[in-house]
Amino acid sequence: AYEKAVKGYITKRKPLGEALDEEIMDELSVKFGIVDDALEDLFKQIQDAGISIVDKDGNPSPLALVTDEIEKEEVSDTAMDEIVTNVRIDDPVRMYLKEIGRYPLISLDEETKLAEAIIAGGEGAEFAKQMLAEANLRLVVSIAKRYSGRGMQFLDLIQEGNMGLMKAVDKFDQTKGFKFSTYATWWIRQAITRAIADQARTIRIPVHMVETINKLIRVQRNLLQELGRDPSPEEIGKELHMAPDKVREVLKIAQEPVSLETPIGEEDDSHLGDFIEDDVIESPVDYTNRILLREQLDEVMDTLTDREENVLRMRFGLDDGRMHTLEDVGKQFKVTRERIRQIEAKAIKKLRHPRRSKPLRDFM
């Protein structure tokens, strides 16, 4: 079943030329218990098929290297000091790093005993889970530092990674040959990357759509290098086996919101919002024209009788913006609809006289 699954996966990914490291772990490694040397063989088999293994950002995956490199994750006291130096952090983070520094690292034998206690269950299982999790809190910090600067605070990344660590503790089975740090790495990375997908953007995009966007952007970047120009949706769709309309939809979803407070110019004294026209609020020119038109209209209406003026104002909504029916106006003046129609026709005829209409023609 495993070999069949690997062949099926390679067949599925070969047209794209790339495979996500997380996807390989979810669909093959974790599912079939592939670890250590067998995991290296799996990565090699996929790469030998001409498929590049990348992370979610399209960069060569560090996980496609020797698995032992993950097991040798730098989580020593020296490495913790390096994190403090290289990652922009504030006092709460320093306090947290100092706190987890109190928990000692454990040996492979101790790890095995804790795992056995977890499997055995009972009162000792919860204590063993706590010990195993605390001993690997540094691993979470070391992994989280790779994702700093991607839209989430460092402490938030650590928190999400800790949730992945707890899931790894619950699911860990040492009888399958995993070293815990290797096994936990996948769960920690998955928790962090999913959190970034969910929370880093102003407008949340579902995880499956984030993966689609990443694939599309990688193909778009490759085509740009090959063609020397921006590829069309049709060209991108051909590479991804996706309809051009779907490509356009994904590209639209992928757009990042831009703040109206974004500084413009070298002096930073102007903002993007200053240059965007408000098509809802009336412009000064339109406002001035409307006031002048109102004044001219009032002067012209003053040449009519009071009844004629009031009928036109009601019929055309000149005062309240609401046009009234002949019946409504007739009730107001206690006459028939026909009489109102006659008064309206007579008033309009008067307004069409050149002497009255000339002042209004400039506004037409």
UniProtKB/Swiss-Prot annotation:
A motif (Interaction with polymerase core subunit RpoC) lies at residues 156-159. Residues 132-202 are annotated as: Sigma-70 factor domain-2. Sigma factors are initiation factors that promote the attachment of RNA polymerase to specific initiation sites and are then released. This sigma factor is the primary sigma factor during exponential growth. The gene is sigA. HAMAP family: Sigma70_RpoD_SigA. GO terms for biological process: DNA-templated transcription initiation. Residues 326-345 bind DNA. This is RNA polymerase sigma factor SigA. Residues 211-287 are annotated as: Sigma-70 factor domain-3. GO terms for cellular component: cytoplasm. Transmembrane segments: none annotated. PANTHER family: RNA POLYMERASE SIGMA FACTOR RPO (PTHR30603), RNA POLYMERASE SIGMA FACTOR RPOD (PTHR30603:SF60). One of its GO terms (molecular function) is sigma factor activity. It comes from Lactococcus lactis subsp. cremoris. The keyword DNA-binding applies.
